Amino acid sequence: MTEQSSKSHPSFMSTEYSLPVFSSQYSDIENKDVLKSNSWDPYAANAPIALSEIPSSSKSGKTNGSKAAVESGLASGAFGNRTGNMNRNTSMSGYTFGSSNFVPYNLLSNTPSFTTSHSSSTTFVPPATMGGGLNNLSSPSSSLYLPGSASYQRSNSKNSSASILQMNTTLDDIPILLRRPGLSSYTPGPSTSRRSISSSSNLGGNPGLIANNPSASKNFAFTSGSSSTNNSTTSSSSMANGLQSISKHSAAFPLLSNATSFFGENLTPSLAASTASTGSTDSSGSNIANTLIAPTPTISPPSANTVGNPSPADTPGFNVPSLISDDPSVSSSLSSSVASLSLQNSNILSFCKDQHGCRYLQRLLEKKNQSHIDAVFAETHPYLAVLMVDAFGNYLCQKLFEHASEAQRSTFIQIIAPKLVPISFNMHGTRALQKIIDLVSSPDQISCIVNALRPNVVLLTKDLNGNHVIQKCLNKFSQEDCQFIFDAICEDPLDVSTHRHGCCVVQRCFDHASPAQIEQLVEHIVPHALTLVQDAFGNYVLQYVLELNNPNHTEAIISYFLYKVRALSTQKFSSNVMEKCIFFAPAAIKEKLISELMDEKHLPKLLRDSFANYVIQTALDNASVKQRAELVERIKPLIPSIKNTPCGRRILSKLERRHPSSKEKPIVYSNSERVNTSSSA
C-alpha cells in the first residue's frame, strides 16, 4: 500500500467530490479551496466499491468497501459514464470500474465521431451522441444524460441551478470534473446558483446513492441487479422510489416544459420540440422491491436518412446542435429538418437568454438560410419584448431583425411597439432598439415606431438610456418623421433643457432640424433665457443657439440680459453665456454689453472675481479699438490692487500681450522688483 493510499480520503461519492459551486456567497479563498480538494485516490480502500450503496463521507473520509454488495450499477457523470466497480487505470485515457471503464469525453474534436461501446459483465454503455454544438464540444466516448427539469446542486448548499443553460461549465472545469467521478444528477432543488452539480443526499436517505440514468425512462429497459447488503430490504425500496421519481422528471438535455427535447433531429438546431415522449417506462415496484436496479440501455444503429449524426430516436443522449454545414446539399437537408420542428414555451426563452445559446442562434442566422431565419423568428417572436431587454437576448434580436424579411420586420416592430418605451429605458433594450431604428426602411415601420414613442418623448429625453433612442431617431429619420420630437420638446422646453440628458437632445435637435423647426425651437426656448442662462445644463442650450450665429436669435437672447450683465458675469454658468454673447453679438449690442462691464464702481470687483475676469478678458479681445482703449485706461489704476491675485495676474498678462504700453515697470513683475522683493524678504 502506497503512502498516498494510507492517507484519509473522502468517499468518491461524497459531497467533497461534487462539482464546486462558484457563488458570490463564497469568498475567493473558499472558491479556490474547492478547486484544491484532494484528488481521488482509487487505492484508499482494499475492496472494490460497488455503485449500489456507498456511504457518505465519514470523519476519516474512507469508503467502506465491505458493505458494498451490489455488484453493478450505472452512473452518468457530466463528462463521462461509469459502470461497475471502480478502480483507477494507470493510463490517462480513463478510469476503470471493476471490469468496466469510465472514459472522459473527447472535447477537442471538431466533428462527431462514434466510438465502440464499453461493456461489462453487468451493464452496457451506449456510444456517444454529441454534435459540434455551442462550443464545438463533440464526440463523447459515452453518452451524456442530463435532466432538463432537474437541478444540479451541491449537497448541503442553498445554491442550485434550475436549468443546465445556467450551468456555465467551461473548459477550465474539465480537470476538476475528471478527478471527481462522483458526479450524477438528482431531483430538482431550489433555483439560485449559477453553477452546481453534486452527489445528492435525498434519495432513500442514502447520501452516496448514484441516481438512475435520467434518460432511462425513455430509452432503457430495467434489469434486475444482484442481491443487496444486509439492510437492502428497507433502503433499496426507498432508493428505487427515488429512481422512479427521477425518471419522471428526466430526459435528454435540453427539455421543454413538457419534458420533450427541443434540439431536433440530425443534431441541427431543432428550434423544435422532439415528437418523442419521455414518459416513464415500465419499472414496477415488484421489480425493484429488494434490489437496486441499474438501467440497461437499448440502442439501434443510426438511421440511414440522417445527415452526419444519428437522430435522437436512434441514440439516447445529450444532443448539442452542430454547426450548419456550408455544403448546399447538406444545408438543404438540414433546413428542411429545422423548419419542420418547433420550440415551445419557456425553454426557447431560456435558450435565447443563455450566452452560448444566443451565440449559436446568431451564427445560425448569419448563414442567411431563409428556412432557419423563418424557424427562429416563428419560435422567438412571442418573446421579442422580453429578449430585447435581456443581456444576451438583445443581441439575438438585433441579428434577427438584420436578417429578417420586410414582412417579418414589420411584424417584429408591431409586436414590440406596445413595450417600446420600457425597452428604451433598459440598458440592453436601448441598444437593440437603436439597431432596429438603424435598419427600418418602410414608412409603415417608421410610423409604428413614431406612434409608440410619441406619448413619452419628454420622459425618454430625460432618461439615461431613452435619450439615445430619441437621438437615433433624429439621426436616422427624416425631418418630417421627427416632427413629433420637436413638438414634444416645445411643449415643455424648460423642463427638457434644464435636464442633464435633455439638454443634449435639444442640441441634437438643432443639428438635424429644418429652418422651420429651428425657428420653432428658438421661439419656445428664448422666453426662458434668463432661467436657462443660470442653469447648469440650460446654459449649454443657450450657447448652442448663440453659436448658430443668427443675428435675430442672438439679439432675442441678449435682450433678456441687458442691464444684468454684471450680475450674470459673476456666476459660474451664466458667465460662459456672457462670453458667447460678447463674441457673437452684433457691434451695436456688443458695445452695450461691454459698457456695462466698464462701470468704474463695479470694475474692481469684476477684475477680482473668479468668473467675471474671464468675461473682462473676452471683452478686451472683442471690443472695438475705441472701446478697448477706454477699458484699458480704466484698468490701469487698478493694477496695484489686483497684481497679486490669480484673477488680476491673468488680466495683466493679457494686457502685456495685447497692450504693451499699459505695462508699468514698478508694478508688473520686473527684474528690479523681483530683486527688491527678495532682498526685503
From Swiss-Prot:
GO terms for biological process: nuclear-transcribed mRNA catabolic process, deadenylation-dependent decay; post-transcriptional regulation of gene expression. The keyword GTP-binding does not apply. Pfam families: PUF, PUF_NOP9. InterPro entries: ARM-like, ARM-type_fold, PUM-HD, Pumilio_RNA-bd, Pumilio_RNA-bd_rpt. Disulfide bonds: none annotated. It comes from the Eukaryota. Residues 180-210, 273-322, 656-681 are annotated as: Disordered. One of its GO terms (cellular component) is cytosol. Gene3D superfamilies: Leucine-rich Repeat Variant. Residues 187-210, 273-286 have a biased composition (Low complexity). Residues 656-666 have a biased composition (Basic and acidic residues). Residues 319-659 form the PUM-HD domain. GO terms for molecular function: mRNA binding. Pumilio repeats lie at residues 342-378, 379-414, 415-451, 452-487, 488-523, 524-559, 560-595, 596-633. This is Pumilio domain-containing protein C6G9.14. Keywords: Repeat. It comes from Schizosaccharomyces pombe (strain 972 / ATCC 24843) (Fission yeast). Residues 669-681 have a biased composition (Polar residues).
